[in-house]
Regions:
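Sec-dependent signal peptide recognition
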Residues: 6-14
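Mature catalytic domains of secreted/periplasmic carbohydrate-active enzymes
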Residues: 25-223
């Protein structure tokens, strides 16, 4: 079969286009605007998890405890953290965060740095550790575990001083090192205000931007 000059040119053009298409390399896309880091992407992929506010406030019916509550008021006799974890798992949640310490300063674990904790409550005859029970329940059901730790402590007499920051970080270190992997840490309520403060019953304000030295605290969390 003979081809005319025009037909030959058309065939040649098609071949050249095909070769060009096969050998072209697409340039990588350039991001427009801020790009999420690995921590932000991991958080986004969680999609759905529980935040449980369970602490002394559960028994005093207060949104914020004043700090003068007695450990004897905390006695959840029917507590079953495995039920919490099971329901969370069945609901499609991927993790649980618990208020390990709210603004009233009461600790759900037997912190060695304060007497204002479950170790002086009637629950489990003073031998309970709700943080441990819940962290183990989360592990059993394949859930991530996180903690909320209030920077503001209306119970501690040293709040507002440098001494308190050492106390706060000591408690944070306990939570980060004694209960397995912690996927998220919440800090909330850092302004200060009125409180019991070991019996002082006064108002204490702090500079929330400088008092806590957040960069150092955040570095502790990310180690």
């Amino acid at each position: 079969m003979k081809f005319s000059v025009k037909q030959k040119l058309n065939i040649l053009s098609i071949l050249l286009i095909s070769i060009s298409s096969c050998t072209s390399v697409e340039e990588p896309l350039t991001a427009v605007g801020p790009v999420p880091n690995e921590y932000q992407l991991a958080w986004q992929e969680l999609e759905y998890y529980a935040f449980i506010h369970f602490n002394m406030n559960t028994f005093t019916n207060k949104e914020w405890g004043y700090g003068d509550e007695q450990p004897s008021q905390f006695n959840p006799t029917e507590l079953d953290t495995r039920q919490w974890a099971r329901v969370a798992k069945e609901s499609g949640m991927k993790g649980i965060i618990i208020t390990a310490k709210h603004h009233d300063g009461f600790c759900l674990w037997p912190s060695k740095f304060t007497e204002h904790s479950v170790k002086n409550s009637p629950w489990r005859e003073g031998k309970g550790d709700l943080i441990r029970e819940l962290s183990e329940a989360c592990k059993e059901y394949g859930l991530k575990f996180g903690v909320y730790l209030s920077p503001w402590d209306r119970n501690h007499p040293a709040y507002g001083s440098a001494e308190y920051i050492t106390y706060f970080r000591n408690q944070l270190r306990e939570l980060l090192t004694q209960y397995g992997d912690i996927f998220e840490v919440w800090f909330d309520g850092a302004n200060g205000g009125d409180g019991y403060y070991g019996g002082a019953n006064e108002e204490r304000r702090v500079d929330k931007k400088s008092y806590y030295d957040w960069p150092t605290t955040i570095e502790m969390v990310r180690r």
